[in-house]
A protein has these predicted regions:
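Short beta-strand segments in beta-sandwich/barrel cores
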Residues: 34-36, 52-57, 79
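Ligand-binding loop in jelly-roll beta-barrel domains
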Residues: 75, 83-106
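Glycine- and acidic-residue-biased ligand/ion/polar-headgroup-sensing regions
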Residues: 41-63
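A short glycine-rich, His/Asp/Glu-containing loop-to-beta-strand
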Residues: 9-36, 43-46, 100
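Histidine-centered active-site/metal-ligand motif
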Residues: 38-40, 88
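Short acidic-glycine-tyrosine-enriched beta hairpin
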Residues: 61-84
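Basic/polar N-terminal segments that are highly enriched at the extreme N-terminus
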Residues: 1-11, 107
Length: 107
């Protein structure tokens, strides 16, 4: 499949809230489960709710900070500010369910 033929999904499992300032999403992945391939078109804040280990699998044309495969131990309460540009799949490589809240910042 070429990049032009690629179908991108939502950045997380479920959209919780949207207004003129933010979009708030929930990501929920069982152990071994992958998210859809998705593109981050806005800067966002990621807050870990549950889980122990996650991987980010970038697409070849991913931009931004996370443009290489990454694995990370995570803990509930951790948060990260991430700039837009990433095109990736999230993969739960842990032993526990992984849940996060992603807050996309509109300008």
């Amino acid at each position: 499949m070429t990049q032009a033929e690629r179908v991108l999904g939502d950045i997380a499992t479920r959209l919780l809230v949207e207004n003129d300032r933010v979009k708030i999403w929930e990501m929920d992945l069982a152990p071994g489960e992958d998210s859809d391939v998705h593109e981050h078109t806005m800067d966002y804040i990621l807050v870990v709710i549950e889980g122990d280990r996650i991987a980010g699998v970038p697409e070849p044309d991913s931009k931004g900070l996370y443009n290489e495969y990454i694995e990370a131990d995570v803990q509930p309460g951790q948060y990260f500010y991430i700039e837009k540009g990433g095109i990736e799949t999230a993969r739960n490589i842990g032993k526990r369910r992984y849940r996060e809240i992603a807050i996309e910042l509109k300008d």
